[in-house]
């Protein structure tokens, strides 16, 4: 096994790097084990020759934490960790948990509520023009308009709230390499609209290839039948994507206000 990934600037410079290709921001402590999705993504990128630094549980009140590696050449990768941050923080009765089993010593309060949104916004504040790619369970389950138990309302796609450029859902070790190689070859992230297992936002419906239309965000907020219809279409297309090669070109479109997801 190679060395652990750099977790601070000193370790990055010790490798002779002046700039990483990616900075992975994670709500968990850095655990380099295949039971942790972040480790799989980072090591897969590393095996393809990319330089990856790991920013574990940064202080989300301090933007300088997000600048310690400098601006990554290809982008920030952001996840809440192995578990949804709201499930990690609250019981089903919405009572606050005080321990975090994904933090050394089970110490609580080392990550924010809605970690993907908060980390993404802080990364954007640190470097306004950096590419921001979100993924993991928290992003995957919120990739389109969805009912949020904690707020007891329908929320927009997390890619909107996080102000991210791209969302990778499900198992991302293959799609992240496609993204990385495209960016490395000079393709702008706004043109990555053709990859399976990704979500992007646009104002132009022409960017979606053979779209399957979903009810708009406004419709699913105001009409329970429209919400059920949206979920049903998503479910059928997700099943198709896992069972039929013919479904590879299907694109679900959620009209969220002025944005198309």
Model-derived regions, located:
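Conserved small/polar residues in nucleotide/adenosyl-binding loops
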Residues: 242-247
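A solvent-exposed, charged loop/short amphipathic helix patch at secondary-structure junctions
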Residues: 86-112
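Short N-terminal or domain-adjacent regulatory/targeting segments
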Residues: 1-16
């Amino acid at each position: 096994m190679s060395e652990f990934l750099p977790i601070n600037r000193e370790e990055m410079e010790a490798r002779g790097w002046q700039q990483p290709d990616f900075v992975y921001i994670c709500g968990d402590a850095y655990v380099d084990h295949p039971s942790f999705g972040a480790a799989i993504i980072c090591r897969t990128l590393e095996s393809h020759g990319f330089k990856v630094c790991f920013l574990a549980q940064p202080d989300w009140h301090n933007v300088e934490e997000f600048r310690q590696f400098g601006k990554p050449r290809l982008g920030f990768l952001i996840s809440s960790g192995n578990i949804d941050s709201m499930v990690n923080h609250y019981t089903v009765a919405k009572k606050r948990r005080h321990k975090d089993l994904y933090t050394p010593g089970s110490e609580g309060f080392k990550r924010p509520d809605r970690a993907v949104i908060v980390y993404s916004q802080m990364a954007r504040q640190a470097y306004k023009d950096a590419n921001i790619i979100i993924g993991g369970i928290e992003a995957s389950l919120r990739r389109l308009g969805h009912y949020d138990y904690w707020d007891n309302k329908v929320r927009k796609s997390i890619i909107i709230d996080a102000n991210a450029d791209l969302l990778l859902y499900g198992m991302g070790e293959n799609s992240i390499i496609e993204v990385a190689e495209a960016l490395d070859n000079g393709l702008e992230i706004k043109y990555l609209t053709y990859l399976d297992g990704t979500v992007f936002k646009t104002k132009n419906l022409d960017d979606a290839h053979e779209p399957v239309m979903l009810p708009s965000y406004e419709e699913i907020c105001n009409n329970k039948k429209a919400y059920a219809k949206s979920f049903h279409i998503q479910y059928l297309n997700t099943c198709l994507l896992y069972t039929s090669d013919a479904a590879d070109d299907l694109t679900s479109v959620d009209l969220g206000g002025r944005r198309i997801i």
